[in-house]
């Protein structure tokens, strides 16, 4: 009987290990966004607690960002961002779900491979199809995902007050850096 229990436990633990090898995950990903313009105060924030998961067999990718996790140099900017622009109480998170086109783990090395990613970004209650380019590198058994792209706040019904518009860029530059284990 003990042997049967032991063999069953080994079988299920083995299956869990096999399944977990199909996914790479992080809960400490980094997203930085910037909407600065010359001659005005820097409009830049970072979030160091972004979650992301990649299915290494299918190329499916999903990411979750808690909006209150973005931190600015100036506390007042952070307050305005959460209360007036992104409305974090009403829209507490942004979610991306997509697919890495032609993803093949075997083709990725430490120098990295560029891939096209297509998916849906839900931000401020609005879902939009987006396409971005990502660089994916192997780092030991881990994957590093790097991307830079632009977003237009108007496309997500994020209203910038007229008094602030001249002090912010019309498009927001987004930098993504995830180390998935």
Regions found by a protein language model. Give the residues of each.
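Bacterial Sec-dependent N-terminal signal peptides
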Residues: 1-24
């Amino acid at each position: 009987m003990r042997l049967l229990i032991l063999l069953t436990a080994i079988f299920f633990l083995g299956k869990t290990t096999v399944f977990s090898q199909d996914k790479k995950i992080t809960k400490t990903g980094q997203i930085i966004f910037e909407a600065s313009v010359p001659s005005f105060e820097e409009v830049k924030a970072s979030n160091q607690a972004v979650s992301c998961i990649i299915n290494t067999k299918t190329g499916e990718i999903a990411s979750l960002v808690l909006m209150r996790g973005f931190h600015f140099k100036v506390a007042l900017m952070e307050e305005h961002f959460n209360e007036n622009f992104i409305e974090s109480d009403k829209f507490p998170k942004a979610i991306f779900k997509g697919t890495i086109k032609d993803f093949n783990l075997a083709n990725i090395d430490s120098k990295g491979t560029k891939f096209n990613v297509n998916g849906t970004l839900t931000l401020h209650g609005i879902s939009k199809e987006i396409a971005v380019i990502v660089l994916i590198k192997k780092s030991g058994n881990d994957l590093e995902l790097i991307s830079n792209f632009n977003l237009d706040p108007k496309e997500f019904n994020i209203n910038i007050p007229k008094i602030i518009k001249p002090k912010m860029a019309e498009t927001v530059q987004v930098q993504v850096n995830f180390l998935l284990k």
